[in-house]
Amino acid sequence: MPAVSVRHLAKSYGDKQAVRDVSFEVEKGDVFALLGPNGAGKTTTIEILEGFRDRSGGEVETLGVDPAERSTQRWLRTRMGVVLQELAVEPYYSVRQVLTRNAGYYPSPRPVPEVIELIGLKEKADDRVKTLSGGQQRRLDVGLGIVGNPELLFLDEPTTGLDPSGRRDTWDLIRQLTSLGTTVMLTTHYMDEVEALANRVAVLNNAEIVAAGTPTSIGGRDSSEVTIRFLLPDGATVSDLPVTVHSLEQGLVEIRTRDELRLLHELTGWALEHDYALTGLSVVRLTLEDVYLHLTRDADEPIERSAK
C-alpha cells in the first residue's frame, strides 16, 4: 500500500478550480517532490493530504486512511510531521524546551537529545529561540517536524534561509530519515534539491499535473538531445570533422546528438589521430530547471537549455 494515494482530486472555491483531476501515488520510504509556481495548487493539494482542508471531489488516502474523515484525523496527525515555510515558535523558550513540549503531543516521539543532534543544534540546545539565527531557526522547524517520529513528513521549502553547509546537512538528515523508512513529501523551488533527494517528481501548473516521473526522466530528459561544443582546432576545417556540425560561430563548434557516446568516441579518436586538442570540450544536457520552466512558463515553445 502506498503512503499517499490521490485519484482525480479536485478542489474548487466558487467558480475557481484550485486543483483539477490530480492523481499520483507516493510509495513508502520515497521522497516525492511536488513542484509548481505559486498559485499552481501545491499548497491546496498538500493541505488536503494533511487533513487540514476538505476536497471537492476525488479520492485521497494518507497512510491508508481518508484524511477528511474526522474519526481518523487524530490518529493520522500523530503519525505525520509538518514543516511549514514559517512556524511560530515561542521566542523565550529554549530549543530543548520547545522540542520537549512538542514531543509530549505524540505517542512514540523520537528522543529529544537525538533530535537536537540530528538538526545540528547541540550547542544551542539551552539557548532561547529568539537568539537563533535564521538558519538555526529553520533547523528547529525541521526538528519540530520530526520529533513525533512520523511515518510521513511534509516539508515545505525546508532549506529556505540556510547557507550551503546547512542545506547539505538538511539533505543528509532527510536521507537518514528515509533510510529508516520515513516517507517525505517535499515542495521546493530549488531544482538541485529535487535532484539530490527525490525519487519521483510531479509538476503542477494551472491546477493540473502537467508532468510526472523521475528527476532524470521527467519531460523527456533522458531521451533528449545532447549538445556537444568545442573550439575548432587550429589547422582543421569543419569538413575535416568526422561528425555532422550543426553550427559554427566564432570558431565554436556545436553538435547535437542522442548518441553521445558514439559521437564522442568518433570525435576524440579523430583528434588523437591528428594530434588535435578539443579545447573547451563540453557536453550540455537538458537540466531539470530547463524542463520545469518549459512546463510551467512556455510549454508551447521548444525547450531551451539554460547552459551556453
Regions found by a protein language model. Give the residues of each.
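An acidic, carboxylate-rich microenvironment
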Residues: 57, 72-75, 97, 217, ...
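ABC-family P-loop ATPase nucleotide-binding domain
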Residues: 1-10, 298-308
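Short secondary-structure transition/capping segments
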Residues: 30, 42-43, 57, 234-237, ...
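ABC transporter nucleotide-binding domain
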Residues: 170-258
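Short, charged/small-residue-rich alpha-helical element at the C-terminal edge
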Residues: 224-298, 308
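A generic structural signal for secondary-structure junctions
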Residues: 63, 81, 103, 107, ...
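ABC transporter nucleotide-binding domains
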Residues: 2-6, 11-205, 211
